[in-house]
Amino acid sequence: MINDKKVLFSGMQATGNLTLGNYLGALKNWVTLSDEYECFYSVVDMHSITVRQDPATLRKRARALLTLYLAAGLDPKKNCIYYQSHVSGHAELAWILNCFTYMGELNRMTQFKDKSAKHADNINAGLFTYPVLMAADILLYQADVVPVGIDQMQHLELTRDIAIRFNNIYGDVFTVPEAYIGKVGAKIMSLQDPAKKMSKSDENPNGSIYLMDDPDTIMRKCKRAVTDSEACIAYREEQPGIKNLLDIYCACLGKTPDEAVREFEGKGYGELKLGVGEAVVSALKPLQDEVARLEKDKAYLDSIIKENAEKAQYFANKTLRKVQHKVGFSDRIR
């Protein structure tokens, strides 16, 4: 607890451009959480280097992601918005937690198997111990809740296991985090393969709408979206392409599926795609305008980065010093 509020931690990697799915499914919902929680939102750039990155590109993407956090409406006075790499406690705690994590637990992580298959030429130790760094990210701030998707639930369970194991040995040190169950954001699927989630790493550039895509690009991608041969606009699982377009339309305009279906009754797929494209362009314009404004104010962004890193380090040190003392490290001389 901080300021009588439960603590919430979440973060995104700076390895690509955020998609409409990231925005509607997560980022848009983060904005309201600071009323109920003390929120830590990280640009998790340390996780990014488990796959080779061009240094200049990584720095550029990290800054762009932090700018998007702010443009989306996250208040840096109410939330702690920071680069993971600017808080040394993440790496320090991760090393200690490595010593309380079993090889067998890490071997069972499905994401390691998936990522190592995709990057067979670079199966490094960091990729293997990625879930331990994720555990450190969460436990460092004594997070009570963590918003996670199904693909990250296994990592959160490992985090809980590590925290409980450590507490059983040394006493009540870590808060054991729970999965955040709140307002469910829209689940946006690929425009080219509606059976899989819209992803910033999609090899098909037409499958994802990126938050900084210009209007012409957005309209073109929507027009090329996969549909079916039913020639009927209905919200049902049997028509995943149409259902996905309706989900996007509803999420952008705050409508229900029933309202959207009635609106497009008797119309063709072309009109639906046009309507979806226009809805996305309209929904993203305020965000894009705010990004453009923030990017011009380098001094302001730099001040946010500095102040929030210091705030995060302050809370991180409170946990880290306690953990270091518990495991037997010598106390620092002040």
Task: Identify the meaning behind each predicted range.
Residues I2-F9, A14-A136, A279-S282, A292:
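N-terminal Rossmann-like or analogous alpha/beta NTP/dinucleotide-binding catalytic cores
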Residues M12-A14, D45-H47, D144-V145, D202, ...:
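Short, histidine-centered active-site or binding-site loop motifs used for metal coordination
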Residues N22, Q154, R160-R334:
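Conserved nucleotide- and phosphate/pyrophosphate-binding catalytic cores
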Residues E38, M103-N107, L140-P147, A251-A260, ...:
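Short helix-capping/linker segments at secondary-structure and domain boundaries
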Residues D45-M46, A135-L139, P194, A251-G254:
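Short connector loops/turns at beta-strand edges and beta->alpha or beta->beta junctions
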Residues D114-F166, Y170, S190:
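Internal, conserved structured core segments that host functional sites
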